[in-house]
Amino acid sequence: MVPEQIDLIKESWAKVVPIKEAAADLFYDRLFELDPTIRPLFKKDLTEQKRKLVAMLNRIVALLGDFGALVHMAEDLGRRHVQYGVEAKHYDTVGAALLWTLRTGLGAAFTPEVEAAWTAAYRTLAGAMKEAAYGVPASAMKKAA
């Protein structure tokens, strides 16, 4: 990621924070719409999970300038998520739900440049998470799928 992309993510995230509860609702609604088989991985009441999602995204955005810390955090997150039953195939669905949520929440502010920045960030994070969780580089997983 280049500095301009980091700036775009930080600027766009600042616009999401005031609507964070609605954004979390949109995200989980879309996630379960895209893949209903993911729903059983979560508790019935998503209140705490939604809070954790927003807190994690806040942390990710804050760490964007520190690539080493960001990757370390993503690796730890990946190892934890595999224990919850998350499979490698779920990462694409989560990414699609995240981008859809940002597009819906930001409207016209979700420009192609903003989308490219968020896509690059998500690919980096998801790649580090999958590698830590499954011990296989993300590039090798794509080839196997």
Each PLM stretch: what is its role?
Residues 1-145:
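Globin-like tetrapyrrole-binding proteins
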